[in-house]
Amino acid sequence: MNPLASIMITLTIILGTMIVMTSSHWLLVWIGFEMNMLAIIPVLMKQHSPRAVEAATKYFLTQATASMLLMLAVVTNLLYSGQWTVTNITNPLASAVMTLALVMKLGLSPFHFWVPEVAQGIPLSSGLVLLTWQKLAPLSVLYQISHSVSPTLLLTVSLMSIAVGGWGGLNQTQLRKILAYSSIAHMGWMTAVLAYNPTLTLLNLTLYILMTTTTFLLFMFNSSTTTLTLSHSWNKSPMIATSTLTIMLSLGGLPPLTGFLPKWMIIQELTKNESLLLPTLMAMMALLSLYFYMRLTYSTSLTLFPSMNNTKMKWHLNNTKKVPLLPPMITLFTLALPLAPALSTLY
């Protein structure tokens, strides 16, 4: 891609997201969504392969449909309230349609169908943007309207997303699809607590983005896209391979790693609100995600696939890539659980 075009596309993506996050007028929010969607399409298609074009087309159709539903809800609310203000939603039907539109943009169940397919058809760098940065704009709008959204609808969507995120990843060998289903499950956890403590959703989002970014950087360092190529990374860089598996267990929420912290705090918050059945179901379904991460760890570390490279490290296998940010990121996002008391005072 032309460097100048790449800079312009990146700035447009950032600007579109910033417009959505800082606007209080629905028309500006819609414009920000459209800017972001149109700018991300070339990023998804930068490989110029049929699979990438297919993924970009699926992404475009889904996001365009969600934007149409969002404008339908906004106009419906305008007819009843006469206002374009984001936080002023008076009509229950408009609130429900608006929530479903944002759920579709986030890729939550039952509108999760596009996330694994799009993530699988694009390169790792584009997948990183899709599963992290692209969550900011819809979730910020959902955060602003959380006071007028039906808690029952949010909890139903969150439980379905956690279940789909766990079940969907069980039979996968493609790392991008595994991370896509993990994203669906994590978004389910965020929406579950949104009606009770929206600020806790921001903590979960921050930790999710940082852990997912670290995981993608490790995969890009190893050039790993499947469990087979991930198992071969032991011969090239054993420490990086070990770190990759540790951060993936953290994504699964295994204590005492960092990924356990947001789940712990969300279950605690739901219990405070006299909701016992919901956190119990969420904790049980979270075991599905943890299971496929532990199975992945076992298959890539304790067993080795048949390969000509299962020998001692050779000079031609030495990895010359240097990523200075990886060591502190790996350390922080696997061993940050002792920060829980400090974070609990903030959230």
Curated annotation (Swiss-Prot):
The keyword tRNA-binding does not apply. The chain crosses the membrane at residues 13-33, 59-79, 96-116, 122-142, 149-169, 178-198, 201-221, 247-267, 274-294, 323-343. It is found in: Mitochondrion inner membrane. GO terms for biological process: mitochondrial electron transport, NADH to ubiquinone; mitochondrial respiratory chain complex I assembly. Disulfide bonds: none annotated. Signal peptide: none annotated. Belongs to the complex I subunit 2 family. This is NADH-ubiquinone oxidoreductase chain 2.
